[in-house]
Amino acid sequence: MRSAKLKFEKRKSRIRHKISRTSNRVRLSVFKSGRHIYAQIIDDSKSITIASASTLDKTIKKIKKSHCNVENAIKIGREIAKKANSAGIKEVVFDRGGYKYHGIIKALADAAREKITF
């Protein structure tokens, strides 16, 4: 258990270091818990959140017990891309936050790529 957590933290710090070098673009940050998925577009130079989407939003929320699945990740990816376009953002840096680029994270990224570029 400890080694898995350590690997996660190492991946997270490695990714954040790479992202900090591309400071001219905003970042699309992804977080997932056991039940929900969250996505935010953050401008690190101004320290503000420009747009956000999650499975807690009324447009996505259903009566299911767990909302952390690929189907909802696609909905969140499309929703965050729509909000980014309305805010005038065309390019972002994808911050997967230490998660492996597989499954839910990949589905969210692919859905967001339909309207914004990484």
Curated annotation (Swiss-Prot):
Similarity-based family: Belongs to the universal ribosomal protein uL18 family.
Subunit annotation: Part of the 50S ribosomal subunit; part of the 5S rRNA/L5/L18/L25 subcomplex. Contacts the 5S and 23S rRNAs.
One Gene Ontology term of the molecular function aspect: structural constituent of ribosome
Entry-linked Gene3D superfamilies: 3.30.420.100
GO cellular component, one term: cytosolic large ribosomal subunit
Cross-referenced PANTHER family: 39S RIBOSOMAL PROTEIN L18, MITOCHONDRIAL, LARGE RIBOSOMAL SUBUNIT PROTEIN UL18M
Protein name: Large ribosomal subunit protein uL18
Source organism: Rickettsia typhi (strain ATCC VR-144 / Wilmington)
